[in-house]
Amino acid sequence: MAGASPSPARPRVVVAGLGDTGLLVATRLARSCDVVGIATRPALVSGQELGNRLTHPDQWRRTYLIPYRRFRRLDRARTIHGRITSVDLDAHEVAVEAADGAIEVVPYDVLVVATGASNGFWRHDRVEGLPAIEADLADAAGQLAAAGTVAVVGGGATGVSVADNLARRGGTEVHLFHSGAEPLPGYHPKVRRWMARHLRDDGVVVHPDHRAVVPDGFTGDRMTTDPIEWSTGQDPFTADLTLWAVGGVRPHSTFLPAEVLDDEGFVRVDEHLRVPGHPEVFAVGDVAASDPLRSSARNWGYRVVVANVRARNAGKDGGLKRYRAPEYRWGSVLGLQDDGLVVVQPDGKRFRVPRWAAEPLLFGVFVTHYLYGGLRAATTRDPSA
């Protein structure tokens, strides 16, 4: 546990989850509120850019694996390394089991749920420290580096990112299997057609219209070596290693009462990202049922939550901001490459940021200073050192 001591003069905001979205909420509110951030790890471990994470882990960790002690804006907040076990919405309290086994009940004036969701081996809610994080990162990258043939099952952004980055790195025969005619469901049709061409140009062997039979009880939380069976009638396929990116997202919401969850376990929210019936509770990111694509993590949902928490604290519940999601997904799919960073837009257009500009300006200035509010230099004990 670390951070500032609470002040009774300021509202207490508990931020459940300090991932990509929760971290931005916590750092924005820490100046005007007593923020308590609760996270299952002692560092930001981003779920973004899995392809770069597996093929260029040193580059990836500089931006996406950062101990919380390096975030200057968290100096004003308190962080608890542990897991929320329950929430009493009437008493305005969360129960936390810390990593050392200690139990603490934390009261709140406002609760922001940003606990994310599990998906494959790269996104989970296990309570772990930096050594375990580093071991998992090295193990996954090592398995892929040793494989001569890799099958990636799933044509979403994660599967596409892994397949293309592996093929670009070279030395591996990469096969991408997806159930539809084109990859990237949820993206604009122009983006989907472009990506299908791009994958083939980069050397990925693309297999459309293949729907895998997922073994009973398997959640994609490990890479496998068994033959892949298909419900669409094709012959089984065997690779040295198979990475599963077939969706099956599981929200981290078991600590919440069922009354605030939808049928899939995601947190129900209104247009202001508030939980209906509980105006002091907000949800944002992958755990929030904010729109059909549950895209508030990528569409500046944190800004809506921050503005609305501030408005509520000021007694201005009538002027809350509304969250609006575009029809299609957008953003960087492949991550930073030798020729730069390609960003696709909701309208199907795309633009490229040259690498010479992306590294110092996008990651060095925009991410480090604007989004994160400044980082302390890494030390020898930090993974990004």
PLM region spans:
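A conserved FAD-binding loop/helix module that cradles the flavin
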Residues: 269, 284-336
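FAD-site-proximal beta/loop scaffold in flavoenzymes
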Residues: 130-148, 236-301
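A Rossmann-like FAD-binding core segment of flavoenzymes
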Residues: 74-94, 106, 171-269, 317-320
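Glycine-rich active-site loop/strand segments that organize a redox cofactor
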Residues: 37-59, 114-143, 342, 356
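FAD-binding core/adjacent interface of flavoenzyme oxidoreductases
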Residues: 2-16, 74-151, 232, 243
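Catalytic nucleophile loop
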Residues: 19-22, 156-160, 302, 306
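Beta1-alpha1 glycine-rich phosphate/pyrophosphate-binding loop at the start
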Residues: 2-78, 164-190
